[in-house]
């Protein structure tokens, strides 16, 4: 059963049945670089993640292909949670991220108590930057976070973005 659907794209509640696809996505180096996180968990530990802690965690399905193409999840911040997105490697650069993000925000703002959603990405992640712009996120430079790159050990900055309910519907 889908939480929300539009044309051929649908979002369903994430379950542990989705863990294997998500785990494979985390094995992808580009995924790890996109999150500045070297992923080295074994599958059995990954499957023990308490998915009920998160207010919104969905699997993205292309209904025409009858395939899972990615995942979106809200972080745990109670006021401005971060919306994270993972499009599986074989489905990238096909517009799924933009469409799924818009659909997720529509659902979140209609059904959850948030007035603003945050997002972040790194300046070298051109696809995510383009997606955030297309969806309507605005830069929030005052919220940028300096970090150490987990791959190069050089300084980097996670760029901060946000979108309000009014901005999405405006």
Please tell me what each predicted stretch does.
Residues 1-28, 60-170:
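Acyl-donor (CoA/ACP) binding surface of acyl/acetyltransferases
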Residues 27-48:
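Conserved GNAT-fold acetyl-CoA-binding loop/helix
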Residues 48-61, 70:
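A short helix-loop-beta-strand connector motif used in the catalytic cores of GNAT acetyltransferases and
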Residues 15-17, 47-50:
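Short linear motifs in intrinsically disordered
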Residues 41-45, 54, 88-91:
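Juxtamembrane/interface motifs at transmembrane-helix termini
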């Amino acid at each position: 059963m889908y939480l929300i659907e539009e044309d051929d794209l649908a979002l369903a509640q994430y379950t542990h049945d989705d863990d294997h696809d998500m785990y494979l996505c985390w094995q992808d180096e580009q995924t790890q670089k996109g999150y500045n996180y070297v992923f080295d968990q074994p599958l059995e530990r990954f499957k023990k993640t308490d998915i009920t802690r998160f207010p919104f965690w969905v699997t993205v399905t292309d209904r025409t292909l009858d395939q899972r193409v990615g995942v979106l999840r809200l972080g745990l911040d109670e006021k401005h949670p971060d919306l994270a997105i993972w499009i599986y490697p074989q489905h990238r650069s096909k517009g799924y991220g933009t469409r799924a993000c818009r659909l997720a925000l529509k659902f979140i703002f209609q059904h959850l108590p948030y007035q603003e959603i945050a997002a972040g990405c790194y300046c070298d992640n051109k696809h995510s930057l383009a997606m955030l712009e297309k969806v309507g996120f605005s830069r929030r430079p005052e919220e940028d976070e300096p970090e150490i790159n987990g791959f190069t050990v050089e300084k980097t900055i996670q760029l901060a973005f946000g979108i309000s309910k009014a901005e999405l519907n405006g």
